[in-house]
Amino acid sequence: MNKKIIIFLLALSMIAYIEVKSDDGLKIKVLNETELTDMLRGSCIQSTRSCDANPSIKLIKEAIKSGKKFKMISVDDFPNDGIVVAVQGIGGGGPWEHVIERTKSQGLEVLPDSERNNMVVDLISDFLGKEVTAIIRSEAAEATATALLVAAERNIPILDAGITGRAVPEVQQSIPWISGIASIPTAIISPWGDEIIIKHAIDEYRVEDISRAIAVASGGDAVITMTPMNGDQIKYAALKNNLSDAIKYGKVTREAVESDKDPIDALVSASSGFLLFNGLVIKSDENGDRGFNWIDVELSGTGDFSGSTYKIFVKNENIIGWLDGELDAMSPDYIYNLDPNTGQSINSNAGFGSYPIGKEVAIIGVPSAYQWRSKMGIELMGPKHFGFEFDFVPIEELQAN
């Protein structure tokens, strides 16, 4: 055989070995920088709100340079006796300003996010008396980088799955809870290192109430670890391949831009979604209250949508959309707000869900996972949960009309 061919085949085998390794008999994929960048941009798309992937990408690249390995394991390959937990920040719109001022005057040290993220996993692990063997993404957006960094720091994989598939405004809004698995025990760390365990709660709504109140009383910021699950449970209570989908979204939009194609068209095709609107932001009335960002958004149509208006109700995330006063999309289906030139989530550099005035935005609607469309899923994330009187209508039906 030709020596060049032999060398080429050897090189291919080495690449395959680098991409898929076996740790303790487990099939684990080592993610490269391109896959990680695509994942983080795709996660911002999945978030259903404004999201800037660049800070997360910077953190991941710095970690790679320092020698960190980012590993991913599929739900099917994860052992039944393994333990996964979700890690994320929890915010609080309308934080207690007097607490912020007092802690500054006291000179209390604000712990780095990376330290708190690991502290909160240690806290839940100690409480459970079991080692955490993988991290599952709690929600899309910045929580993806959090999960990746915690997993890499602990030299464990991230699960190719999620407990929401999107970003959600409230803790109880999760696929495990729909599947009968509670988020408790839940561990919380404040910016200054206060440690809180929610051992028991009446229901998931109380977990949301308590953890959100801690965030509001902590300058609008806390870190939470929740929803411990074993390998048996994740097989029915997690969204499989959720991170692979994020990689796909990031990849198709990137490649479309690189080849001078329309990234929005590429994403609509990849997500089996619908282009709902193109327009400029002419109104964004924002109010931080009870731990959330509440926003009324209005867009003025451009291009094929000239002469039309689009209104969006936001509670941290995009919840309801109206085209010219008619219902057009609603939670739990996904409403993405994207830059039409890049296909990436718009970047507001402001509060959760913010829309910069004058920004050009493409709105895409995507059918949600089947779990969200169950009776309980609609109770948790449907329009009536957010105070509206109408029933949930799937986006396919709304667009057919």
Label every model-predicted segment.
Residues 283-401:
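C-terminal non-catalytic interaction/assembly regions of soluble proteins
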Residues 248-301:
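Oxyanion-binding "anion nests"
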Residues 34-94, 347-369:
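N-terminal low-complexity or amphipathic/hydrophobic leaders
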Residues 83-131:
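Glycine-rich oxoanion-binding loops at beta->alpha junctions
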Residues 80-101, 173-214:
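A structural-propensity feature for long, helix-poor, extended segments
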Residues 53-58, 117-118, 140-149, 165-169:
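Short glycine/serine/threonine-rich phosphate/pyrophosphate-binding segments
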Residues 63-78, 156-194:
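Catalytic or ion-translocation cores adjacent to nucleophile or general acid/base/metal-coordination motifs
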